[in-house]
């Protein structure tokens, strides 16, 4: 019947593909895959031929042995099939060691680290067979070793295996395998030997072949060739003529693991730790992952992808490794292609962003440039951005700073609402209310860099107001950033805005107490004046100069030449601003030493005069800018030599500029009054520097190194009477920063706040009417919502009123004599 004549190989659940590679003993190896799932496998095939009964019996022995032997260093059996014509053995996907070495020749060959771990695995497999299984492999050579995709060596070739003490039952080897026989097999006088002697001789042959290629004849073992020096003494023991001196496999491992031994290196140590990682203590895992990133550069790429990466993912998924897995994770991610990255790394990254661990959040923000290109827009807007924005309101300044800088990378992938609404609200609050000067400066910097991605309506509403506010910031680099912001985004302003809004603001900056800020203001003013003169001389060029004003999406290269004031990658600006934290009277640390990462506390007032501000950027992208002066371009960069002192000045009340909102109409007289007041305050030379962001020492600059024209640092003026803090001055930490304030007060703004809290002011910060940065809706409420609620304000007013009534009653009781209506008795 046809049923009985059907070929059983048709039901074989694996497809055999690829070319057949011949192996000793009649075997061949081919690549294959499972028919249902497509999982890759290796298929060993043996064709049964008449007249080769001994070889066929050895092949069947190998098929039986591989099914029963389970060990990490022995070839893993998956499936098999035996017919009258052929034998099939399906294993994990592997490559013969000889083929693997040839493939690696073009890339520099197999490194000693790989060889050390590979031999370590083969010796462990022999130790298992001899000491635990009481079995003799009897075929250890290069053709019996296979390499998996992670670069790990597996022992195969079980054709000639036999039980220890039953040597007579072993199948006879082929002629091509006789060169691996130990000398005692032919010399009957050397009958005294250990059970492992033959396998250890073959191990010596394997070592010779790994370093020197296929063994031509047994006498070639006397020549060391390229064998590693640290392995030579142990190799000589293996190929010694006396079988009694050949060590046990476990003893051989111990000898090579001793200090200075061939198996004593970071690669072997890493692998041994990974094998036992499930039973390691959390502290040991923490230390291991911290040191792993440094060693990855010397490890094979395949090993990192297929061995270490799964362990990192498992450690994050089920362990408590935390943020320490991120550096090695992203380092290995560079070895993956786009599909592998999307499949393995991105799901973990998305999950990490929802973590409440601050260390993990800041590490993610710092490493974002490594994986941002693999994130698609729906993932960024739906799963990442909602978690990232929480960093804008974090109490840790380092997280706020990193969150701001990460927007440089996220902005191109944000949708309309997240970019033009949510992000701008957070930027408005940070620039107006954050107590860290570097963070306010970084916010201005970032806004200028992402300006091309904003829609035209948002740009017209936000940019002028934001940069105008920055020019009145007490932190000098913030003022410089505001001036440079105007220069970098000059093509987004109409000629009417340039003349009516931008130039009046820049003219006010020409009286800035810092020379570098003034110089940049003059250069930027000349740039805008050149544009206006061009239009005045040739009105037909107006359309060309305003072509980007209403462009929906400008190219990011528009602001790419902003004199390096910010860079595409994420780095820290704060570390440039903050060098020392003590005052002049304190013993300051050495210049350039990074501040320790600690929580920032409000420092007490001191009498240190305000140091000079860092240089401002020297170029603008405008084609109308005149040539820079040679003196500015030739000066040396003094940023690292500046002693920035404490970032909180002695006189907060005088140096703090009025907190006007970004929705201010620059044509109104009240704004001009504010500008005059700000200029007059600055002209006295009183500045406020905010507390240093000590945690920013984690980074190394946000591209400001070449940003500003550098000039020699100004000499510190001697402390004069005008620079001493007035009596009764309080530090910034004593003020209620969340309370609404007034704009038109002179003197100590905060100490008189309670007396005027019930009065309505013209300042938009306290206005109840809806507004925004440019005069539209929803922006005023952003900052107003950050303060006290109406119920709390009303309650405070009642309490203050009650205190006033009680004080008057106490005064009347203390008065002498009777009081008449409308008359106050004088003492």
Swiss-Prot record:
SUPFAM superfamilies documented for this protein: ARM repeat, Protein kinase-like (PK-like)
Residue ranges of HEAT repeats: 345-383, 384-422, 502-540
Composition bias, Low complexity: 615-624
GO-annotated molecular function: ATP binding; protein kinase activity
Keyword terms, alphabetized: Coiled coil, Repeat
Annotated Basic and acidic residues bias: 629-638, 757-766, 792-814
Purpose: Regulates COPI-mediated retrograde protein traffic at the interface between the Golgi apparatus and the endoplasmic reticulum. Involved in the maintenance of the Golgi apparatus morphology.
Protein name as it appears in the record: N-terminal kinase-like protein
UniProt key word Magnesium: no
Disulfide bridges in this chain: none
Domain notes: The protein kinase domain is predicted to be catalytically inactive.
Polar residues bias spans: 666-677, 742-756
Bias-annotated ranges (Acidic residues): 639-650, 774-783
Location of the region described as Disordered in the Swiss-Prot/TrEMBL record: 580-827
Transmembrane feature ranges: none
PANTHER family: N-TERMINAL KINASE-LIKE PROTEIN (PTHR12984:SF3), SCY1-RELATED S/T PROTEIN KINASE-LIKE (PTHR12984)
Protein family: Belongs to the protein kinase superfamily.
Domain Protein kinase residues, every copy: 16-309
Stretches of the chain forming a coiled coil according to its record: 788-817
């Amino acid at each position: 019947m046809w049923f009985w004549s059907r070929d059983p190989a048709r039901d074989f659940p694996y497809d055999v593909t690829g070319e057949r590679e011949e192996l000793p003993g009649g075997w061949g190896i081919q690549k294959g895959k499972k028919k249902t799932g497509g999982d890759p496998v290796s298929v060993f095939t043996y064709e049964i031929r008449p007249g080769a009964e001994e070889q066929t019996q050895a092949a069947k022995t190998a098929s039986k042995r591989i099914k029963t032997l389970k060990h990490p260093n022995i070839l893993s059996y998956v499936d098999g099939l035996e017919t009258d014509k052929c034998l099939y053995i399906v294993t994990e996907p592997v490559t013969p060691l000889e083929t693997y070495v040839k493939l690696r020749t073009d890339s520099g060959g197999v490194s000693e680290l790989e060889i050390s771990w590979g031999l370590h695995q083969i010796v462990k497999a022999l130790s298992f067979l001899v000491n635990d299984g009481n079995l003799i492999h009897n075929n250890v050579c290069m053709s019996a070793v296979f390499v998996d995709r992670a670069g790990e060596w597996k022992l195969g070739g079980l054709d000639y295996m036999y039980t220890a003490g039953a040597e007579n039952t072993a199948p006879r080897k082929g002629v091509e395998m006789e060169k691996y026989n130990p000398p005692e097999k032919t010399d009957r006088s050397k009958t005294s030997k250990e059970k492992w002697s033959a396998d250890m001789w073959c191990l010596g042959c394997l070592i010779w072949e790994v370093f020197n290629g296929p063994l031509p004849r047994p006498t070639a073992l006397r020549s060391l060739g390229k064998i590693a020096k640290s392995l030579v003494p142990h190799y000589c023991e293996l190929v010694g003529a006396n079988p009694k001196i050949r060590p046990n496999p476990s003893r051989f491992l111990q000898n090579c693991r001793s200090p200075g031994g061939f198996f004593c290196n970071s690669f072997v140590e890493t692998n041994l730790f990974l094998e036992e990682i499930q039973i390691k203590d959390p502290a040991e895992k923490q230390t291991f992952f911290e040191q792993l990133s440094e060693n990855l550069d010397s490890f094979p790429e395949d090993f990192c992808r297929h061995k270490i990466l799964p362990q990192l993912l498992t450690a994050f998924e089920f362990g408590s490794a935390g943020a320490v897995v991120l550096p090695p994770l992203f380092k290995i991610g560079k070895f993956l292609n786009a599909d592998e990255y999307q499949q393995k790394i991105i799901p973990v990254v998305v999950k990490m962003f929802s973590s409440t661990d601050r260390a993990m959040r800041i590490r993610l923000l710092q490493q974002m440039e490594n994986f941002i290109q693999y994130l698609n827009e729906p993932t960024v807007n739906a799963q990442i951005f909602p978690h990232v924005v929480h960093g804008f309101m974090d109490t840790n300044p380092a997280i706020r700073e990193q969150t701001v800088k990460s927007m440089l990378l996220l902005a191109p992938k944000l949708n309309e609402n997240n970019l033009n609404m949510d992000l701008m609200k957070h930027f408005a609050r940070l620039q107006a209310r954050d107590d860290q000067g570097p963070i306010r400066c970084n916010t201005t910097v970032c806004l200028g860099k992402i300006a091309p991605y904003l829609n035209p309506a948002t740009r017209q509403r936000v940019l002028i107001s934001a940069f105008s506010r920055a020019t009145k910031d007490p932190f000098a680099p913030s003022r410089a950033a505001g001036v440079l912001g105007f220069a970098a985004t000059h093509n987004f302003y109409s000629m009417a805005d340039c003349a009516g809004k931008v130039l009046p603001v820049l003219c006010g900056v020409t009286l800035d107490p810092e020379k570098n800020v003034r110089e940049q203001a003059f250069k930027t003013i000349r740039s805008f004046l050149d544009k206006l003169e061009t239009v005045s001389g040739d009105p037909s060029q107006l359309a060309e100069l305003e072509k980007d004003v209403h462009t929906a999406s400008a190219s990011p290269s528009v602001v790419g030449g902003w004199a390096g004031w910010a860079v595409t990658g994420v780095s820290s600006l704060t570390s440039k601003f903050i060098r020392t934290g003590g005052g002049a009277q304190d013993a300051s640390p050495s210049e350039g030493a990074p501040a320790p990462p600690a929580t920032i506390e409000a420092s007490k007032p001191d009498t240190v005069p305000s140091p000079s501000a860092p240089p401002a950027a020297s170029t603008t992208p405008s084609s109308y800018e005149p040539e820079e002066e040679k003196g500015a371009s030739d000066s040396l960069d003094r940023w690292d030599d500046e002693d920035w002192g404490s970032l909180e000045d002695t006189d907060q009340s005088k140096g703090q500029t009025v907190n006007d909102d970004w929705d201010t109409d620059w044509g109104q007289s009240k704004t001009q009054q504010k500008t005059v007041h700000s200029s007059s305050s600055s002209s006295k030379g009183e500045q406020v520097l905010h507390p240093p962001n000590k945690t920013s020492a984690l980074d190394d600059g946000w591209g400001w190194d070449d940003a500003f024209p550098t000039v020699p640092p100004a000499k510190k003026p001697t402390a004069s009477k005008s620079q001493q803090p007035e009596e009764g001055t309080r530090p910034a930490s004593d003020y209620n920063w969340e309370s609404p304030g007034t704009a038109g007060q002179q003197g100590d703004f905060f100490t008189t706040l309670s007396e005027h809290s019930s009065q309505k002011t013209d300042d938009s910060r306290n206005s109840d009417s809806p507004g925004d940065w440019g005069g539209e809706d929803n922006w005023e409420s952003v900052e107003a919502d950050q303060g006290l609620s109406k119920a709390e304000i009303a309650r405070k007013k009642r309490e203050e009123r009650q205190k006033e009534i009680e004080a008057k009653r106490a005064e009347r009781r203390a008065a002498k004599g009777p009081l008449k209506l409308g008359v106050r008795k004088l003492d």
